[in-house]
């Protein structure tokens, strides 16, 4: 089931309200059990955490609010767990520099800071917050013919030039799928999600460790 973000962005609020109700019904048992509901896409998290409670009414709104309280971004959960001493990741040394591009919804929810803190735990890597504003794609905005030039112009302000001039041995991290598409479409650079980068750096057990 879709989070409803595309419907909300297009102003199709009646259909978005139906999605919010369905998602609330499906996710509420997890929230009631105090289980974190982990999202990898900031716009999806925003739809569940911020928009769904406002779209539904009555008792359903109370359940949606409970779901929202247990909805977390991947970077947020891992950094919180690490900082609290409840778990760590055995990371090998990573790229010399990690360029971080925050998704617009990630910024609006104040979740760039935990992403930067988590990436800063990669050994020997320097994390640079590009603070580049919107990538220009804005969900489906940049995919339409009428918005193509505006979308590119927004990206060319900071993000796309930064991608083209990345130092050797560095990597561009972006949690938003639309952001990654925008970067690749205009520069050929393949930005990666934080989870994918961390997965690639997990120290693999040796044969002796497995014995």
Predicted feature locations:
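Iron-sulfur cluster-binding electron-transfer modules in prokaryotic oxidoreductases
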Residues: 1-211
């Amino acid at each position: 089931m879709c989070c409803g973000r595309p419907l909300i962005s297009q102003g199709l609020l009646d259909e978005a309200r139906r999605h919010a109700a369905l998602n609330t019904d499906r996710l509420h048992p997890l929230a009631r059990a105090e289980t974190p509901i982990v999202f990898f896409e900031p716009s999806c998290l925003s739809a569940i955490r911020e928009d769904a409670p406002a779209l539904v009414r009555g008792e359903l709104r109370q359940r949606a609010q409970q779901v929202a309280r247990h909805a977390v971004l991947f970077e947020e959960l891992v950094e919180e767990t690490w900082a609290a001493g409840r778990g760590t990741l055995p990371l090998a040394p990573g790229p010399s520099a990690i360029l971080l591009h925050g998704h617009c919804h990630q910024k609006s929810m104040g979740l760039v800071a935990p992403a930067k803190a988590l990436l800063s735990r990669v050994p020997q890597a320097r994390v640079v917050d590009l603070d580049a504003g919107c990538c220009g794609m804005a969900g489906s905005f940049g995919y339409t013919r009428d918005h193509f030039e505006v979308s590119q112009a927004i990206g060319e302000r900071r993000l796309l030039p930064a991608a083209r001039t990345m130092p050797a041995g560095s990597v561009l991290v972006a949690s938003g799928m639309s952001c990654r598409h925008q970067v690749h479409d205009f520069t050929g650079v393949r930005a990666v999600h934080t989870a994918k980068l961390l997965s690639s750096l997990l120290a693999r057990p040796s044969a002796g460790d497995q014995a």
